Amino acid sequence: MSILHNIVSKKELKRRMFFETEPRLTLSFYKYFFIKNTQEYRDRLYKNFYKYNVLGRIYVASEGINAQISVPKKYYSILKKFLYNFDIELNNLRINKSLDNEKSFWVLCVKIKKKIVQDGIKEHFFNPNNVGIYIQSEQVNSMLNDKKTIFIDMRNSYEYAIGHFENAIEIKSITFREQLKKVIQLMAYAKNKKIVMYCTGGIRCEKATSWMLFNGFKHVYHLEGGIIGYVHDARKNGLPVLFKGKSFVFDNRMSEKISDEVISYCKQCGKSSDVYINCKYSSCHLLFIQCENCSVKFHSCCSLECMKKYNFYMLNNDLKKISY
């Protein structure tokens, strides 16, 4: 019987990732559609992705599929064809290529979830397939210059911090579930105005447009392919990219650079910086922005307290090694 999950240690997988020289592409895709047997669907995906040395994170739920993956470049066309033929619902699936191809994932993880994006929506009559109008880069740029159009960022606050469209409204939150509750209340005054919603790859803003329509908003739009799709389309058509800063990504890269503007600040000294790290003291692991100077000063920790704890931990480890 095949083992349909990872059995190699995280440390070893990370080591393999950093030493691998094979060119890879980082891809993302999603689709809202009904999946009857999620376990069977998940297992078939795992077997085939494993065969093509795919790494990454894939969620399967009765409402659809959501994936961020790293694929050997030589298998890209084969994998694309496989996905199109895997399920009729995935035929001509939109696949986003990342803006850079730095090392992103080190393990293949295919999980069954209740939902492919946690939204907290419990209304029985909510229809996620009733969505807003897709727009591409030319229309996005035009609407950004229209003062009557409202842009709403449907990403978490820490994502918004390092990059966003100018004048886009931030729905301050750390979860999408929380955002959906807030956005209806905060935007109640704009039910008859043009609203454009965006996120990284499209999955959150697509569901957000459904939620807005369900709650009586009349003119709702969203970026086809999210920020990633917008940037690719603008560059392809020679249009200015109006997104400022970096786009946060949920993998080893942490972010993708889109423009040269640095619009965020170091948590510790307040200087301009757009580099996210996790506190080096593993019991803390706080995600925060840190400049190069503070990285040296605090040993990549978020505070003096964590730095002291980290140094004490490392000293104890060194003493144990000596004693052996």
Curated annotation (Swiss-Prot):
Signal peptide (from-to): none
SMART domains per UniProt: RHOD
Record organism: Buchnera aphidicola subsp. Acyrthosiphon pisum (strain Tuc7)
GO molecular function term, any single one: oxidoreductase activity, acting on paired donors, with incorporation or reduction of molecular oxygen
Protein name as it appears in the record: tRNA uridine(34) hydroxylase
CDD domains: RHOD_YceA
Job of this protein: Catalyzes oxygen-dependent 5-hydroxyuridine (ho5U) modification at position 34 in tRNAs.
Keyword tRNA processing recorded: yes
Any single GO BP term: tRNA modification
InterPro entries in alphabetical order: Rhodanese-like_dom (IPR001763), Rhodanese-like_dom_sf (IPR036873), Rhodanese_C (IPR022111), TrhO (IPR020936), TRHO_N (IPR040503)
Enzyme's top EC category: oxidoreductase
Catalyzed reactions per annotation: uridine(34) in tRNA + AH2 + O2 = 5-hydroxyuridine(34) in tRNA + A + H2O
Family: Belongs to the TrhO family.
Coiled-coil blocks: none
Record: active site: 199 (cysteine persulfide intermediate)
EC numbers: 1.14.-.-
Keyword Secreted among UniProt keywords: no
Residue ranges of every copy of the Rhodanese domain listed in the record: 145-239
Keywords: Oxidoreductase, tRNA processing
